[in-house]
Design a protein with these regions (language model features):
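The feature captures the ABC ATPase H-loop/switch
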Residues: 85
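Conserved G/P- and acidic residue-centered "switch" motifs that form tight phosphate/ATP-binding loops
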Residues: 82
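N-terminal beta1-alpha1 cap of cysteine-dependent amidohydrolase-like domains
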Residues: 1-79, 89-97, 101-145, 151, ...
Length: 173
């Protein structure tokens, strides 16, 4: 998508403090933080330790969390998708459910392992766009269908962030 509109995508390696963030941020117009099979480590949001075997990526956390805050402070647009969205919340002081599917009242947002990959990443549920937000402001309808594959989810929204859309179970997406 970036190339289609005349931009040049740049992959930022997960090198933490080895990256000169100020230099990097002076040379980009926006950041996209994509999904990943790994989860944000719970110590970043004062959560309980994860179950043994939970996949984390400390190098990514040490790169993305400070980079998100620095980009926003400079007015650089940031888009978080899947894990990237969870990172945005944590970077600003929010907390996550580690396993949304184990929280009463929430549906299972993980990929159904017993279905083909093409269906796993297909449209999964409705998303209710909230009035007054950016998504509503660009003309999205009140309800859209989305794919939704994640184990973690927003437990407490970070100060300064606002809800743009909700899953049918009320989970912020």
């Amino acid at each position: 998508i970036v190339s289609v509109v005349g931009g040049m995508p740049v992959i930022i390696p997960a090198l933490g403090e080895q990256i000169d963030q100020q230099y990097l941020l002076q040379h980009i117009d926006g950041l996209v933080f994509p999904g990943s099979p790994s989860n944000v480590e719970p110590h970043h949001y004062r959560g309980p330790a994860s179950d043994a075997g939970t996949l984390h990526d400390a190098a990514r956390d040490s790169t993305t969390l400070p980079l998100i805050k620095a980009a926003i402070a400079l007015g650089i647009p940031v888009l978080g998708i899947c894990r990237g969205f969870q990172e945005m919340n944590v970077a600003f002081g929010g907390a996550l459910h580690q396993k949304v599917h184990e929280v009463d009242g929430y549906m299972d947002h993980r990929e159904p392992e017993d279905t083909p990959v093409g269906q796993q990443y297909g449209l999964r549920h409705a998303l209710h766009v909230q009035p007054g937000g950016l998504l509503a402001g660009i003309g999205l309808p009140d309800e859209i269908q989305v794919n939704s594959i994640h184990g973690q989810g927003v437990q407490r929204l970070a100060p300064g962030l606002r809800v743009e859309a909700l899953a049918p179970d009320g989970l912020i997406e």
